[in-house]
Amino acid sequence: MVKDILAPGLRVVFCGINPGLSSANTGFPFAHPANRFWKVIHLAGFSDRQLKPEEAEKLLDFRCGVTKLVDRPTVQATEVKLHELRSGGRNLIDKIEDYQPAALAVLGKQAFEQGFSQRGIAWGKQKIAIGATMVWVLPNPSGLNRIKTEKLVEAYRELDQALIMRGL
């Protein structure tokens, strides 16, 4: 099981869709070697060095956290069922209300749309918020996602800059 890494007062909580098999086997988030999460958050400015999956708890040192919409591991996120995403969206709202980070970054447009019953959303900051928490949708860093790493970094950096502009 991949546990959440959450605490009050975080700048951002990154929300993946669900654990892949590598994460399920190791217990660490974004553990597959092809997953670009750790590289991207470092290059975007969220950490001062590239962490390894087994150092996930150190995210808290950078006021970042990690959670997921669905606990069930799969080979591909496309195997996650709609009812799991909807239930996960409700559970995620509860977590965010409890911890109140400055921002929630859901990693994947389709997962966000299905988990939050939204349609036709754009990348970036969303019109909805969870209390005082800004909601962002960023591209998923999975190695299965064809988006170039530079574009991922650009999208994540936009969130980092928005938080800096708010003094966070």
Swiss-Prot record:
Sequence similarity: Belongs to the uracil-DNA glycosylase (UDG) superfamily. TDG/mug family.
GO cellular component: cytoplasm
Lineage of origin: Bacteria, Pseudomonadati, Pseudomonadota, Gammaproteobacteria, Enterobacterales
Keyword field contains DNA repair: yes
NCBIfam families noted in UniProt: PRK10201.1
Pfam families reported for this sequence: UDG
Name of the protein in its database record: G/U mismatch-specific DNA glycosylase
EC number(s) stated in the UniProt entry for this protein: 3.2.2.28
SUPFAM superfamilies the record matches: Uracil-DNA glycosylase-like (SSF52141)
Catalytic activity: Specifically hydrolyzes mismatched double-stranded DNA and polynucleotides, releasing free uracil
Species whose genome carries this gene: Salmonella paratyphi B (strain ATCC BAA-1250 / SPB7)
Source taxon at top rank: Bacteria
Cellular compartments annotated: Cytoplasm
Top EC category: hydrolase
Keyword tags: Cytoplasm, DNA damage, DNA excision, DNA repair, DNA-binding, Hydrolase
GO molecular function: DNA binding; pyrimidine-specific mismatch base pair DNA N-glycosylase activity; uracil DNA N-glycosylase activity
